[in-house]
Design a protein with these regions (language model features):
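General beta-strand structural signal in soluble alpha/beta enzymes
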Residues: 7, 30, 52-53, 80, ...
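A short, polar/charged loop-to-alpha-helix boundary motif
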Residues: 22-31
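Acidic, glycine-enriched active-site microenvironments
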Residues: 1-9, 14
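Gly/Ala-rich beta-loop-alpha elbow adjacent to hydrolase catalytic centers
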Residues: 248, 252, 257
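Short hydrophobic/Thr-rich beta-strand motif most characteristic of the beta2 strand and flanking loop
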Residues: 198-204
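Amide-donor transfer/coupling interface in amidating biosynthetic enzymes
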Residues: 35-38, 44, 58, 63-93, ...
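Short glycine/threonine-rich loop/turn motifs
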Residues: 219-229
Protein backbone atom coordinates (compact mmCIF):
# COMPACT_ATOMS: atom_id res chain seq x y z
CA UNK A 1 0.00 0.00 0.00
CA UNK A 2 1.23 3.49 -0.82
CA UNK A 3 1.93 6.25 1.72
CA UNK A 4 2.25 10.00 1.39
CA UNK A 5 3.88 12.76 3.45
CA UNK A 6 2.83 16.37 2.86
CA UNK A 7 4.74 19.29 4.40
CA UNK A 8 3.21 22.67 5.16
CA UNK A 9 5.46 24.40 2.60
CA UNK A 10 4.08 22.22 -0.20
CA UNK A 11 6.86 19.62 -0.37
CA UNK A 12 5.56 16.12 -1.05
CA UNK A 13 7.11 12.67 -0.44
CA UNK A 14 5.75 9.25 -1.36
CA UNK A 15 6.67 5.76 -0.19
CA UNK A 16 5.25 2.49 1.06
CA UNK A 17 3.08 2.10 4.13
CA UNK A 18 3.72 0.03 7.22
CA UNK A 19 2.27 0.09 10.70
CA UNK A 20 -1.31 1.32 11.10
CA UNK A 21 -3.59 2.23 8.21
CA UNK A 22 -4.50 5.77 9.21
CA UNK A 23 -3.70 9.48 8.83
CA UNK A 24 -1.89 11.57 11.44
CA UNK A 25 -0.86 15.22 11.64
CA UNK A 26 2.20 16.46 13.54
CA UNK A 27 5.52 18.26 13.38
CA UNK A 28 8.10 16.79 10.98
CA UNK A 29 11.47 16.32 12.73
CA UNK A 30 14.52 14.09 12.29
CA UNK A 31 16.65 11.99 14.62
CA UNK A 32 20.31 11.22 13.87
CA UNK A 33 20.71 8.19 16.18
CA UNK A 34 21.94 4.99 14.55
CA UNK A 35 19.95 2.80 16.93
CA UNK A 36 17.43 3.05 19.76
CA UNK A 37 14.32 3.46 17.62
CA UNK A 38 12.10 1.82 20.24
CA UNK A 39 13.20 4.35 22.87
CA UNK A 40 12.49 7.12 20.35
CA UNK A 41 9.00 5.80 19.63
CA UNK A 42 8.06 5.61 23.32
CA UNK A 43 9.72 8.84 24.50
CA UNK A 44 6.91 11.21 25.60
CA UNK A 45 8.97 14.17 24.37
CA UNK A 46 8.02 13.11 20.82
CA UNK A 47 4.29 13.63 21.37
CA UNK A 48 2.62 14.87 18.16
CA UNK A 49 5.83 14.64 16.12
CA UNK A 50 6.42 12.70 12.91
CA UNK A 51 9.97 11.40 13.26
CA UNK A 52 12.31 10.66 10.36
CA UNK A 53 15.34 8.50 11.18
CA UNK A 54 18.53 9.42 9.29
CA UNK A 55 20.01 5.91 9.67
CA UNK A 56 19.02 3.97 6.53
CA UNK A 57 18.07 0.59 8.07
CA UNK A 58 15.53 0.60 10.90
CA UNK A 59 13.89 -2.34 12.64
CA UNK A 60 16.89 -4.68 12.44
CA UNK A 61 16.70 -5.71 16.11
CA UNK A 62 12.94 -5.93 16.30
CA UNK A 63 10.90 -4.93 19.34
CA UNK A 64 11.20 -6.01 22.97
CA UNK A 65 9.32 -5.19 26.15
CA UNK A 66 12.37 -3.90 28.05
CA UNK A 67 13.45 -0.81 26.11
CA UNK A 68 10.21 1.17 26.20
CA UNK A 69 10.56 4.59 27.84
CA UNK A 70 6.85 4.86 28.70
CA UNK A 71 3.67 2.82 28.57
CA UNK A 72 2.84 3.68 24.93
CA UNK A 73 4.09 5.00 21.60
CA UNK A 74 4.01 8.81 21.49
CA UNK A 75 5.19 9.68 17.96
CA UNK A 76 2.47 10.69 15.51
CA UNK A 77 4.24 8.94 12.62
CA UNK A 78 7.51 7.17 11.81
CA UNK A 79 9.53 7.61 8.60
CA UNK A 80 12.39 5.31 7.52
CA UNK A 81 14.39 4.66 4.37
CA UNK A 82 14.40 0.88 4.66
CA UNK A 83 12.34 -1.21 7.08
CA UNK A 84 13.74 -4.55 8.21
CA UNK A 85 11.25 -7.38 7.71
CA UNK A 86 13.50 -10.00 9.33
CA UNK A 87 14.50 -8.62 12.76
CA UNK A 88 17.12 -10.56 14.69
CA UNK A 89 17.89 -10.13 18.38
CA UNK A 90 17.72 -12.48 21.35
CA UNK A 91 15.30 -10.14 23.14
CA UNK A 92 13.03 -9.49 20.15
CA UNK A 93 9.37 -10.42 20.50
CA UNK A 94 8.23 -9.13 17.11
CA UNK A 95 8.77 -6.67 14.30
CA UNK A 96 8.32 -2.93 13.96
CA UNK A 97 5.45 -3.16 11.46
CA UNK A 98 3.19 -5.13 13.79
CA UNK A 99 4.25 -3.05 16.80
CA UNK A 100 3.11 0.21 15.20
CA UNK A 101 0.02 -1.35 13.64
CA UNK A 102 -1.20 -2.57 17.04
CA UNK A 103 -0.68 0.92 18.49
CA UNK A 104 -2.40 2.92 15.76
CA UNK A 105 0.71 4.69 14.46
CA UNK A 106 1.38 5.02 10.70
CA UNK A 107 4.81 4.27 9.27
CA UNK A 108 6.29 5.10 5.90
CA UNK A 109 9.29 3.49 4.21
CA UNK A 110 11.01 3.91 0.88
CA UNK A 111 10.89 7.70 0.83
CA UNK A 112 14.05 9.73 0.22
CA UNK A 113 14.89 10.37 3.87
CA UNK A 114 18.13 12.15 2.98
CA UNK A 115 16.23 14.69 0.88
CA UNK A 116 13.64 15.13 3.63
CA UNK A 117 16.25 15.67 6.34
CA UNK A 118 18.19 18.18 4.23
CA UNK A 119 14.93 20.02 3.57
CA UNK A 120 14.06 20.17 7.28
CA UNK A 121 17.62 21.23 8.09
CA UNK A 122 17.43 24.11 5.62
CA UNK A 123 13.81 25.16 6.14
CA UNK A 124 13.27 24.09 9.75
CA UNK A 125 10.91 21.65 11.45
CA UNK A 126 7.40 22.16 10.13
CA UNK A 127 3.85 20.90 10.24
CA UNK A 128 3.11 17.80 8.21
CA UNK A 129 0.56 15.07 7.59
CA UNK A 130 1.39 11.41 6.91
CA UNK A 131 -1.25 9.12 5.46
CA UNK A 132 -1.36 5.39 4.76
CA UNK A 133 -5.11 5.02 4.23
CA UNK A 134 -5.63 6.57 0.80
CA UNK A 135 -7.09 9.89 1.99
CA UNK A 136 -7.14 12.45 -0.84
CA UNK A 137 -4.47 15.13 -0.93
CA UNK A 138 -7.11 17.84 -0.71
CA UNK A 139 -8.44 16.35 2.53
CA UNK A 140 -4.91 15.93 3.85
CA UNK A 141 -4.15 19.61 3.16
CA UNK A 142 -7.28 20.55 5.07
CA UNK A 143 -6.22 18.48 8.09
CA UNK A 144 -2.71 19.91 7.90
CA UNK A 145 -3.99 23.47 7.91
CA UNK A 146 -6.12 22.84 10.98
CA UNK A 147 -3.27 21.52 13.15
CA UNK A 148 -2.05 24.26 15.56
CA UNK A 149 1.67 23.41 15.60
CA UNK A 150 4.02 23.26 18.58
CA UNK A 151 4.43 26.89 19.65
CA UNK A 152 2.22 27.67 22.63
CA UNK A 153 1.25 24.01 23.14
CA UNK A 154 1.20 22.61 26.69
CA UNK A 155 1.63 18.94 25.81
CA UNK A 156 3.38 18.02 29.05
CA UNK A 157 0.08 17.90 30.94
CA UNK A 158 -1.22 15.31 28.48
CA UNK A 159 1.59 12.81 29.12
CA UNK A 160 2.19 13.42 32.85
CA UNK A 161 1.25 10.88 35.50
CA UNK A 162 -2.13 11.45 37.13
CA UNK A 163 -1.13 11.00 40.78
CA UNK A 164 2.08 10.82 42.87
CA UNK A 165 3.86 7.46 43.03
CA UNK A 166 7.16 6.11 44.36
CA UNK A 167 9.73 4.93 41.81
CA UNK A 168 12.55 4.03 44.21
CA UNK A 169 12.44 3.46 47.98
CA UNK A 170 15.75 2.13 49.38
CA UNK A 171 16.10 1.45 53.10
CA UNK A 172 18.89 4.01 53.52
CA UNK A 173 18.55 6.55 50.70
CA UNK A 174 21.50 8.75 49.77
CA UNK A 175 19.06 11.61 49.11
CA UNK A 176 15.30 12.09 48.71
CA UNK A 177 14.16 13.40 45.32
CA UNK A 178 10.73 14.67 44.31
CA UNK A 179 10.44 14.39 40.53
CA UNK A 180 8.10 16.54 38.44
CA UNK A 181 6.74 14.44 35.59
CA UNK A 182 5.73 16.13 32.37
CA UNK A 183 6.69 13.11 30.27
CA UNK A 184 9.75 11.79 32.09
CA UNK A 185 11.48 8.71 30.65
CA UNK A 186 11.66 5.48 32.62
CA UNK A 187 15.45 5.30 32.39
CA UNK A 188 15.90 8.63 34.15
CA UNK A 189 13.93 7.31 37.10
CA UNK A 190 15.69 3.94 37.03
CA UNK A 191 19.21 5.39 36.96
CA UNK A 192 18.36 8.01 39.58
CA UNK A 193 17.20 5.15 41.79
CA UNK A 194 20.44 3.29 41.05
CA UNK A 195 22.36 6.08 42.82
CA UNK A 196 20.63 5.03 46.04
CA UNK A 197 18.14 7.90 45.98
CA UNK A 198 14.54 7.79 47.15
CA UNK A 199 12.45 8.92 44.18
CA UNK A 200 8.83 10.08 44.39
CA UNK A 201 7.16 11.15 41.14
CA UNK A 202 4.56 13.94 40.99
CA UNK A 203 2.48 15.20 38.03
CA UNK A 204 3.71 18.48 36.63
CA UNK A 205 0.12 19.69 36.86
CA UNK A 206 0.50 19.74 40.67
CA UNK A 207 4.10 20.79 41.39
CA UNK A 208 3.23 22.14 44.84
CA UNK A 209 2.63 18.56 46.02
CA UNK A 210 6.32 17.83 45.45
CA UNK A 211 7.61 20.59 47.72
CA UNK A 212 6.97 18.84 51.01
CA UNK A 213 8.89 18.19 54.21
CA UNK A 214 11.35 15.34 53.97
CA UNK A 215 12.34 16.08 50.37
CA UNK A 216 15.99 17.03 49.85
CA UNK A 217 15.74 18.16 46.23
CA UNK A 218 13.48 18.44 43.20
CA UNK A 219 14.19 17.09 39.71
CA UNK A 220 12.21 18.50 36.78
CA UNK A 221 12.21 15.97 33.95
CA UNK A 222 11.87 15.96 30.19
CA UNK A 223 8.65 16.30 28.22
CA UNK A 224 7.01 17.59 25.03
CA UNK A 225 5.66 20.90 23.83
CA UNK A 226 6.45 24.57 24.38
CA UNK A 227 7.95 25.30 27.82
CA UNK A 228 6.55 28.84 27.80
CA UNK A 229 3.03 27.38 27.84
CA UNK A 230 3.57 25.85 31.31
CA UNK A 231 2.97 29.09 33.19
CA UNK A 232 1.53 27.37 36.27
CA UNK A 233 4.46 25.02 36.91
CA UNK A 234 6.93 27.82 36.18
CA UNK A 235 5.33 29.99 38.85
CA UNK A 236 5.37 27.14 41.37
CA UNK A 237 9.04 26.45 40.63
CA UNK A 238 9.87 30.13 41.07
CA UNK A 239 8.43 30.00 44.58
CA UNK A 240 10.77 27.19 45.65
CA UNK A 241 14.02 28.48 44.11
CA UNK A 242 16.61 29.13 46.79
CA UNK A 243 14.76 26.97 49.32
CA UNK A 244 15.54 23.53 47.86
CA UNK A 245 18.15 22.33 45.35
CA UNK A 246 16.41 21.95 41.99
CA UNK A 247 17.86 20.11 38.99
CA UNK A 248 16.44 19.87 35.50
CA UNK A 249 16.75 17.73 32.37
CA UNK A 250 15.62 18.84 28.88
CA UNK A 251 12.15 20.42 29.39
CA UNK A 252 13.14 20.82 33.04
CA UNK A 253 16.18 22.83 31.91
CA UNK A 254 13.90 25.18 29.98
CA UNK A 255 11.31 25.50 32.78
CA UNK A 256 13.97 26.35 35.35
CA UNK A 257 15.38 29.02 33.04
CA UNK A 258 11.88 30.51 32.75
CA UNK A 259 11.45 30.34 36.52
CA UNK A 260 14.66 32.36 36.92
CA UNK A 261 13.29 35.02 34.55
CA UNK A 262 15.00 33.98 31.31
CA UNK A 263 13.29 33.37 27.98
CA UNK A 264 12.98 30.34 25.70
CA UNK A 265 12.65 30.16 21.93
CA UNK A 266 11.95 27.58 19.23
CA UNK A 267 15.04 26.13 17.56
CA UNK A 268 15.07 25.93 13.77
CA UNK A 269 15.11 22.12 13.63
CA UNK A 270 16.03 21.12 17.16
CA UNK A 271 18.55 18.64 18.52
CA UNK A 272 17.43 15.03 18.24
CA UNK A 273 19.89 12.17 18.24
CA UNK A 274 22.51 10.26 20.19
CA UNK A 275 25.57 12.01 18.75
CA UNK A 276 25.28 15.60 20.00
CA UNK A 277 28.63 17.13 21.13
CA UNK A 278 28.57 19.18 24.33
CA UNK A 279 31.48 20.96 26.04
CA UNK A 280 31.66 21.34 29.80
CA UNK A 281 32.80 24.95 30.11
CA UNK A 282 34.24 24.34 33.58
CA UNK A 283 36.67 21.62 32.50
CA UNK A 284 36.85 21.84 28.71
CA UNK A 285 35.80 18.18 28.51
CA UNK A 286 33.70 17.31 25.47
CA UNK A 287 30.96 14.70 25.84
CA UNK A 288 28.85 13.06 23.15
CA UNK A 289 25.29 13.25 24.41
CA UNK A 290 21.76 12.13 23.65
CA UNK A 291 19.32 14.98 23.04
CA UNK A 292 15.68 15.46 22.06
CA UNK A 293 14.26 18.97 22.13
CA UNK A 294 12.92 21.66 19.84
CA UNK A 295 13.21 24.67 22.18
CA UNK A 296 16.23 26.37 23.74
CA UNK A 297 17.15 28.96 26.37
CA UNK A 298 17.91 32.50 25.15
CA UNK A 299 21.50 33.36 26.24
CA UNK A 300 21.23 37.08 27.04
CA UNK A 301 18.10 36.66 29.13
CA UNK A 302 19.71 33.80 31.08
CA UNK A 303 22.85 35.84 31.75
CA UNK A 304 20.67 38.64 33.13
CA UNK A 305 19.38 36.27 35.84
CA UNK A 306 22.87 35.69 37.23
CA UNK A 307 23.00 32.09 36.01
CA UNK A 308 26.28 30.74 34.63
CA UNK A 309 26.45 28.58 31.50
CA UNK A 310 28.15 25.26 32.30
CA UNK A 311 27.61 23.36 29.04
CA UNK A 312 27.57 24.43 25.38
CA UNK A 313 26.34 22.53 22.31
CA UNK A 314 29.27 22.56 19.88
CA UNK A 315 27.20 22.31 16.68
CA UNK A 316 25.41 25.63 17.10
CA UNK A 317 26.74 27.01 20.43
CA UNK A 318 23.35 26.95 22.12
CA UNK A 319 23.09 26.52 25.88
CA UNK A 320 23.23 22.89 27.04
CA UNK A 321 23.49 23.50 30.78
CA UNK A 322 23.63 26.17 33.47
CA UNK A 323 23.93 26.64 37.20
CA UNK A 324 22.63 29.37 39.50
CA UNK A 325 24.38 28.94 42.87
CA UNK A 326 22.34 31.62 44.62
CA UNK A 327 19.05 29.99 43.63
CA UNK A 328 20.39 26.44 44.04
CA UNK A 329 19.58 25.48 40.44
CA UNK A 330 21.51 23.11 38.14
CA UNK A 331 20.11 22.04 34.77
CA UNK A 332 21.16 20.42 31.50
CA UNK A 333 19.47 20.31 28.11
CA UNK A 334 20.71 16.83 27.22
CA UNK A 335 19.75 13.37 28.51
CA UNK A 336 22.27 11.83 30.93
CA UNK A 337 20.37 8.53 31.03
CA UNK A 338 21.49 7.98 27.40
CA UNK A 339 18.62 5.79 26.27
CA UNK A 340 19.53 5.56 23.49
CA UNK A 341 22.99 7.05 23.31
CA UNK A 342 26.57 7.11 24.56
CA UNK A 343 27.39 6.87 28.25
CA UNK A 344 29.80 9.85 28.40
CA UNK A 345 27.58 11.74 30.87
CA UNK A 346 25.61 8.87 32.35
CA UNK A 347 27.25 8.20 35.70
CA UNK A 348 28.98 11.57 36.04
CA UNK A 349 25.95 13.82 35.76
CA UNK A 350 23.47 11.74 37.74
CA UNK A 351 25.92 11.53 40.63
CA UNK A 352 26.46 15.29 40.29
CA UNK A 353 22.71 15.69 40.73
CA UNK A 354 22.86 13.63 43.93
CA UNK A 355 25.81 15.62 45.31
CA UNK A 356 24.07 18.87 44.40
CA UNK A 357 21.01 17.69 46.33
CA UNK A 358 23.33 17.03 49.27
CA UNK A 359 24.61 20.61 49.15
CA UNK A 360 27.80 20.04 47.13
CA UNK A 361 28.35 22.39 44.17
CA UNK A 362 28.24 20.63 40.76
Amino acid sequence: MGAILLLEDGRRFVGQAFGAVTTRVGEAVFNTAMSGYQEVLTDPSYAEQVVCMTAPHIGNTGINLEDEESERVHVAGFLVRSLSHAPSNWRSTGGLHRYLAERGVPGMQGLDTRALVRHLRDKGAMRCVVSTDGTSEAALREQLGAWPGMVGRNLAVEVACKAPWVSSDPKQPTVRFAVLDGGIKRNILRLLGDTGAYVRVHPITDPASAFTDGVDAVLVGNGPGDPAALTGPVGELRSVLGKLPVVGICLGHQLLALALGAETYKLKFGHRGANQPVRDERTGRVEITSQNHGFGVEPKSLAATGAVVTHTHLNDHTISGFVHPGKRVFAVQYHPEAAPGPHDSRSILLHQFVRFAQGIDP
